[in-house]
Amino acid sequence: MVELMVVIFIIGIASAAVVMTVRSPDRGVRDEAERFAARVAALRDNAIVQSRSMAVTIRPSGYGFERRDNGAWVPLSEAPFTSTDWQRGTSVQMSGARQMRVAFDSTGMPSSAANIIIKHDNVAVTLALAATGDVRVVR
């Protein structure tokens, strides 16, 4: 009887270890969307702190950040605002547009609300940018 209990205990421990290591199929795209959302929110906050317009440009290949300087958009190169490519196999949809720029003014308000769909391995998540500047990832 004790041997049977020991075997059941070992099987339970082994199955718990397997469950803890299995990743959800949507975890990769969700992680990428969360990273992107955090960087967009940081850009919005930076626009407020620096009291200047800043923008994120989203392309099929990735995204980059810019600041308004003397009437022109200038790419940012300091972390965390470096240009970033999407993971291999990731695609984005932006309201039918091929490329999109969303600018934040000095109060943190975006130039437009946007829903950006990020897809990878047949799993999609949406980054919702509200007219108030709120940035969140929704399923």
Segments and roles (model prediction):
Residues 13-139:
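N-terminal helix-rich module
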Residues 1-9:
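N-terminal signal-anchor/signal peptide hydrophobic helix marking the start
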